[in-house]
Structure formats: C-alpha cells, structure tokens
Curated annotation (Swiss-Prot):
Signal peptide interval: 1-16
Source organism of the structure: Metarhizium anisopliae
GO cellular component entries: extracellular region; plasma membrane; side of membrane
Entry protein name: Adhesion cell surface protein MAD2
Sequence repeats by residue range: 166-173, 174-181, 182-189
Entry comment on modification after translation: The GPI-anchor is attached to the protein in the endoplasmic reticulum and serves to target the protein to the cell surface. There, the glucosamine-inositol phospholipid moiety is cleaved off and the GPI-modified mannoprotein is covalently attached via its lipidless GPI glycan remnant to the 1,6-beta-glucan of the outer cell wall layer.
Compartments reported by the entry: Secreted, Cell wall; Cell membrane
Glycosylation sites: 225, 275
UniProt keyword annotation of Glycoprotein present: yes
Assigned protein family: Belongs to the RBT5 family.
Region of interest (Disordered), ranges: 224-257
Bilayer topology: Lipid-anchor; GPI-anchor
Domain notes for this protein: The tandem repeats might be heavily glycosylated to produce a rigid elongated structure that holds the adhesive N-terminal domain at the cell surface.
Keyword Cell membrane: yes
Length: 306
C-alpha cells in the first residue's frame, strides 16, 4: 500500500513538472540553456546569459510558472509578464507581446576610487615624499537587462532615376552663324570639333552667344555730283561700237545725223551680289559717246564729198 502511494506521488510530481514545461504550454521562449549549478535544481536560462551561484533559485517554480529562470525586466520578455519583479524569478507565461522587440544584454560596471596621500604617520617608515595618488579599482558589477532591437531598413532607389556616370564632352560640329538679311559667313577660327557661336534667334533650342563681326561685301556709294537713274538697262553682250553709215549710191544734199548706238560706260559689268546698291549711269559718259559718234559721222561724210 505504501509503495502504491509513493508511486502515485512521484507520478503527480512528474505530471506537474511536465505541465510547467514551455513546450506543453505552447510558449515560444527561444534558445534556452540548461543549468545544473543551482543546488541540484535543473533550470533553463535564455541563451547568452550566465548565472552565479548567488542568483540561483532555492526552490522549484511555483504554480503557474515554468522552469525558465529570468533576470529582472520591465518589458515582456520571452513571453513573461512579471515585469515588476526586481529579482531573478521564474517565467510566468502569457500571450503578451512587447511594443518593440528586445534582446538580453550583459553590461559590466566598474567603479574607480582615487585616494591622495598628503602625509604619513610617524610609524610609517617608507612614506613617499610629496603627494602620492593611489588608484583603487572596485570589483565590477554585472547587470543583465533587456535592450530594444533596432531594425535596419535599406532604402532602395528605382533604377530609372539613376544619373549617367559620364556626361558627353564632345559637341556637334560648327554651325554657320547667320544674321537676318546678310550672306552667311564663316566664323573666324571655326573648324571641326570646335564649339559654334550661334547668333540669337537663328535656330530654336540654341544658346545665345556673341558672334564675331561678319565681313560683308563692299557697298557702292553714289558720288555727290551724279544723279541716280530710275532704272538701269542690262549691258549688251557686244562691247565694240557699231557705226551705221548711209548708202554710197545716194549723195544727200544736206548732211543728216547718222544713227549712233549709245554704249554703256566702259568698266560697267554685272552688279555685285549680296548687299549692294545699284550704281547710276554716268551722264558724262553718255555725252562723250555721242560726241565721238558725231565726229566719226562727219569724217565719213567728208570722205564721200571728196
């Protein structure tokens, strides 16, 4: 009978221990490390946390807790809602979630104490001469606490917004600079591969630039003592004077004026192209031509009469 009761008690203890297991409670604690240093108690610690003998539990987990030994925390950690406990404790499972993810960290704090010796007692034989500074280091204090986990977000830039690696350094060939009403001229110093100077308003989409002076055709000016005819007849193709003489069979009783063709002044030619002014016909040259024609006619008549 006693053996039956002992077996039943052992089974009850085992079942109670399994009921407090994190796997049976559906608790996701993460990586746990088993520790057997605490007076023969088998407890679990979160991964990365070490424990001293002074911090070990003295008994098993109470009702409603599991065998995961926790340092104090003030935010939900590993599914534990015992946030107000300032000592090591067993995990009290819950379905709560922290506002931000946290992880355990171990910090070590050391204190340094500085002492200054001004004088020594008479009994001190090896007293240093003058002030002496002695540094005393207090043993370090280790604290385990949760810290928030900062997630890193990578900022991506669309490929369509990327800029070209290099900018073309070459420019188009030269473009003749033109001005309204003038003959297109060649810019001084222009050549293949040079940047053209574009006159404002000559083509859309070009940048204005100052163009050098364009050489124009010479403009003929009218002399002050000559008149400008209304029209100018084109010069004939034949430049040799042609004299028309009367028939030798008939002898006129009275000298008649022969028909004389008036030629244009010598040296006149095709007008210049481009920006030019129509040159006038020289009145004096026409009169000289008429006089020459009259003298030639009179000479012919005199030869016939002789």
């Amino acid at each position: 009978m006693k053996s039956v009761i002992a077996v039943a008690a052992i089974a009850a203890v085992a079942s109670a221990h399994e009921a407090r297991s994190p796997l049976d409670l559906g608790l996701k604690v993460g990586n746990l490390v088993g520790v057997d240093l605490c007076l023969g108690l088998h407890v679990k610690l979160p991964a990365g946390i070490s424990i001293k003998t002074d911090d070990c539990p003295t008994q098993g987990p109470p009702a409603g807790c599991i065998d995961v030994w926790h340092p104090p925390h003030h935010v939900p950690m590993d599914g534990c809602d015992d946030n107000d406990n300032d000592e090591w404790h067993y995990v009290h499972p819950c379905d709560c979630k922290p506002e931000a993810p946290h992880t355990w960290t171990t910090s070590t704090v050391t204190q340094t104490q500085v002492k200054t010796l001004i004088s020594c007692a008479p009994t001190v034989t090896d007293c240093p001469a003058g002030p002496h500074v002695t540094t005393v280091v207090v043993p370090a204090t280790t604290t385990i606490c949760p810290v928030p986990v900062h997630s890193t977000t990578m900022a991506t830039v669309p490929a369509g917004n990327t800029l070209p690696a290099t900018v073309p350094a070459t420019m188009p060939g030269t473009v003749p600079a033109t001005m309204p009403g003038t003959v297109p001229g060649t810019m001084p110093g222009s050549g293949p591969g040079t940047v053209p100077a574009v006159v404002p308003g000559t083509a859309p989409g070009t940048l204005p630039a100052t163009a050098p002076a364009v050489t124009q055709a010479p403009v003929w000016t009218k002399p002050a003592n000559q008149s400008m005819p209304a029209t100018q007849a084109p010069p004939p193709a034949i430049t040799t004077p042609v004299v028309v003489a009367p028939s030798p069979a008939t002898t006129p009783s009275k000298a008649s004026s022969p028909a004389v063709v008036v030629l244009p002044p010598v040296g006149t030619g095709a007008p210049p192209t481009g920006n030019w002014t129509t040159p006038p016909v020289m009145a004096g040259a026409a009169q000289n031509s008429q006089k020459v024609g009259a003298v030639v006619a009179m000479g012919l008549i005199a030869a016939l009469l002789i």
